[in-house]
């Protein structure tokens, strides 16, 4: 089980990313537009750098919905490998069966 503070930190990051998503997209569009002048690009880069560090989506960490474990989390299920195995053995995950050959 992950510390409660780490789980809270991730939820706070998710809210920050959501809050600044439109502004980041707007600034990145200016930067990536080839028709923008050098001054516009420069100002957009400075504004982008002044946004909070946690506003970047790449700083988010996928965590298990049950335990909060940060590693070995399957995107499709949102569970870590341990809890996914337990859920599959109980039959809680529809369509997922243990391989046998």
Swiss-Prot record:
GO terms for molecular function: rRNA binding; structural constituent of ribosome. GO terms for cellular component: cytoplasm; small ribosomal subunit. GO terms for biological process: translation. The keyword Ribosomal protein applies. Gene3D superfamilies: 1.10.287.1480. InterPro entries: Ribosomal_uS14, Ribosomal_uS14_bac/plastid, Ribosomal_uS14_CS. SUPFAM superfamilies: Glucocorticoid receptor-like (DNA-binding domain). Keywords: Ribonucleoprotein, Ribosomal protein, RNA-binding, rRNA-binding. Part of the 30S ribosomal subunit. Contacts proteins S3 and S10. Belongs to the universal ribosomal protein uS14 family. Binds 16S rRNA, required for the assembly of 30S particles and may also be responsible for determining the conformation of the 16S rRNA at the A site. HAMAP family: Ribosomal_uS14_1. This is Small ribosomal subunit protein uS14. The gene is rpsN.
